[in-house]
Amino acid sequence: MFGKAGLGGLMKQAQQMQENMKKAQAKLAETEIEGEAGNGLVKITMTCAHEVRKIDISPDLIQEAADDKEMLEDLILAALKSARGKAEETANKTMGAFTQGLPPGVGDFFR
């Protein structure tokens, strides 16, 4: 099926792909995105590796939420889900470029 030269070339391509994927993963680990809820009253900044870097709650919301802890919790959760969704989307776009055209599941081999 593959000659020695063909198999060697294929292995070299696979190694290069793995190196490029590692670089992309490292970049994603530093790429920050922001999710928000309540028209920006709660903002969460996280990396595409899901490391939360910052939570910003509007002082106005803190005053309003003094009597409504559940509302504040819901807004924080919504902002976190928003940030996580954006992080996943960004990561999938970036990593998808490496696995485009490969059979399903083969891309997981390189992660």
From Swiss-Prot:
InterPro entries attached to this UniProt entry: YbaB-like_sf (IPR036894), YbaB/EbfC (IPR004401)
SUPFAM superfamilies named in the record: YbaB-like
Gene Ontology terms, MF aspect: DNA binding
Keyword Cytoplasm: yes
A single Gene Ontology CC term: bacterial nucleoid
Main location class: cytoplasm
Keywords carried by this UniProt record: Cytoplasm, DNA-binding
Domain of life: Bacteria
Location of this chain's protein in the cell: Cytoplasm, Nucleoid
Pfam family, one: YbaB_DNA_bd
This protein's record includes keyword Ubl conjugation: no
Family statement: Belongs to the YbaB/EbfC family.
UniProt-listed HAMAP family: DNA_YbaB_EbfC
Subunit description: Homodimer.
Function in brief: Binds to DNA and alters its conformation. May be involved in regulation of gene expression, nucleoid organization and DNA protection.
The protein, known as: Nucleoid-associated protein NMB1444
